[in-house]
Regions:
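Multi-pass alpha-helical transporter architecture, strongest
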Residues: 158-181
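Intracellular juxtamembrane helix-capping segments at the cytosolic ends
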Residues: 103-116
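Paired small-residue
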Residues: 88-96
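Extracytoplasmic gate region of multi-pass secondary transporters
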Residues: 1-41, 45-48
Length: 181
């Protein structure tokens, strides 16, 4: 289970940089308040659609495949605003991010349910919660530290995207633990 846990740590580390600093990045790029409000509306629409979009994948994936796919898509969503503030880029980023980020949490619950006996589900979910919390604590600090250097927030977003991509690679290494109990 260690690869899935490491992948989820990187999710916590990477996704939170996007959520913490996206408004600041968009403002730096000259995006106005109206478009930022639209950004959040579109992100929310993606969240509403996400469970419908990913339910089948979460039911079928027994190892870390779902976590890997979702982390990889989040890495792409995090990279997109680095390349500009064109309305289509911003829309693509927020829609992809919204359609994906909460399903990562669901992917860990699905992994636990597919791989551990019911008596161990609480402990399994607790382990994922702990590594996620650690990532959420460390992620904004590193993103902010990177953003304080040359390249500003773009560099911070590159760091977040790299963490998410690493999380995808780590999760992909996670094989099913055995038959569900």
């Amino acid at each position: 289970m260690r690869h899935a846990l490491a992948g989820y740590l990187m999710f916590g580390f990477g996704y939170i940089g996007y959520m913490t600093f996206i408004v600041t990045l968009l403002r730096e790029q000259g995006v106005g308040a109206g478009r930022i409000a639209g950004f959040y509306a579109l992100l929310g629409a993606g969240v509403v659609a996400s469970s419908w979009l990913w339910a089948g994948v979460l039911q079928r994936a027994r190892g870390g495949q779902a976590l890997a796919l979702l982390n990889g898509l989040l890495a792409v969503a995090t990279l997109v605003p680095v390349f500009g503030s064109h309305p289509l880029l911003v829309a693509a980023s927020c829609l992809l991010f919204g359609c994906t980020f909460l399903s990562v949490v669901a992917s860990t619950t699905a992994f636990v349910r597919h791989n551990l006996p019911a008596s161990a589900w609480t402990a399994g979910i607790a382990a994922f919660t702990i590594v996620f919390a650690a990532g959420q604590i460390l992620g904004p600090s590193l993103t902010g530290w990177l953003a304080d250097g040359p390249g500003g927030l773009r560099r911070g977003f590159l760091g977040s995207a790299a963490a998410l991509a690493l999380g995808a690679v780590l999760a992909l290494r996670q094989k099913p633990l055995g038959q569900p109990h």
